[in-house]
From Swiss-Prot:
Homodimer. Pathway: Purine metabolism; IMP biosynthesis via de novo pathway; N(2)-formyl-N(1)-(5-phospho-D-ribosyl)glycinamide from N(1)-(5-phospho-D-ribosyl)glycinamide (formate route): step 1/1. This is Formate-dependent phosphoribosylglycinamide formyltransferase. The keyword Nucleotide-binding applies.
Amino acid sequence: MQIGQRIGTPLSESATRVMLLGAGELGKEVIIALQRLGVEVIAVDRYPNAPGHQVAHRAHVIDMTDRAALRALVEQERPHLIVPEIEAIATDELAAIESAGLAEVIPTARATQLTMNREGIRRLAAEELGLPTSPYAFADSLDELRAGIAKVGYPCVVKPVMSSSGKGQSVLRGDADVEPAWQYAMAGGRVNHGRVIVEGFIDFEYEITQLTVRAINPASGEVSTYFCDPIGHVQVAGDYVESWQPQPMSPLALERSREVAHKVTAALGGRGLFGVELFVRGDDVWFSEVSPRPHDTGLVTLCSQRFSEFELHARAILGLPVDTSLRAPGASAVIYGGLDEAGIAFEGVAAALAVPNADLRLFGKPESFVKRRMGVALATGETTDEARSRAKQAAAAVRPVSAK
């Protein structure tokens, strides 16, 4: 496939085929963006009827950590591009697939290997690139965890080296918290490696996501780096509950944020959109994490930017030009399931959409849990404060109910 030169017709011999590994709500939006550009999309997830399965040309259910199953599916479908949307993937097999020339992995197989767990990316950022981070240590046992805590001090955060959306994370304020945190981390890891990172607290004012796009510059034909306006967000127990764009920052803090984002994404390489998470206090910036894919806090870009993070990702991976301009101040607010049940319904949708400048995305997840993210309310306003108020009002109007 000639990147950026031609796109074929879906379901024909000329098709440009993209396989998404992970078909949740973020993957669903990437699929829609790709399909609008005429791409044939294959969605893969670990459970049937995932949000992205519902809109893809073809859907498959496999254990993506199973190297043989992953290789067999790639050989069956023959995608031109493989786009990982989650961490729980046999990344060593992706590297083998890429080196064998079966498909191009986005952004690169190496990037997926480094970012699949917190250890790889933290060591790259802090030890190789010299970026400012919180103090940290890694532990393979309860005794090592205690030693790590002695190094970084209380309060601290313990996380599995491989998990997502806050799973397995604990805040520790004293010795009594250590053993429960270890047990919780072991239960919360996506792939149970029995290894955790312990991070010292940073006294920050706010957190941001700096969406960073590595895309072909049409003027030079080479990869350039583009930045979206910074996204502010609130997290509870490691899960994002609302986000807004733009986040006000000092000029120096913004400059430093983009320097950090540029360094870490350049080190990862390839094309695509990256979500770089940073802590900020005054003019000071610390690197937290990076995802080589659209970020949940970036759902706000569905209303705030000319092109959403999903459209930017689609364009970048296809070698097409990008435009990261802001359209209006915007905000997103999460809609939780509120109950444990399959096939729930939603009431209050009309009331939510009656909020000025508001919109909804109901993800279509087949099963609800009390704290599962089932949708998001979006809104724009004259200011981010107005947008946040509207998004929260719209989210509060939606009521998940039993369909029984």
